[in-house]
């Protein structure tokens, strides 16, 4: 019994850290989806085209990392930080020639968290 408790004491921090990392990764995937919508809107790409191209990839990343358990928390976080995130991503999207390369920016965001 003492050995099991000692082992649990060693493993518990690693498990807690893994859970935190998983939650953070899911939060970043949600943010990447938010940025994708902003970038597309800024560059005049239709919502339908954006959804058709990126929704499957976003869903795959969310499923891969088991993000369903963090849905409510991440949606609340996005709502709370909407203005800050808009400022962050629209500033980037206002750069010259951004729209010519916006798909590369979106790919970069997704690759970072997939």
Each language-model region and where it sits:
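Compact alpha-helical subdomains of small soluble proteins
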Residues: 47-114
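Hydrophobic h-region of N-terminal signal peptides that target proteins for export
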Residues: 8-18
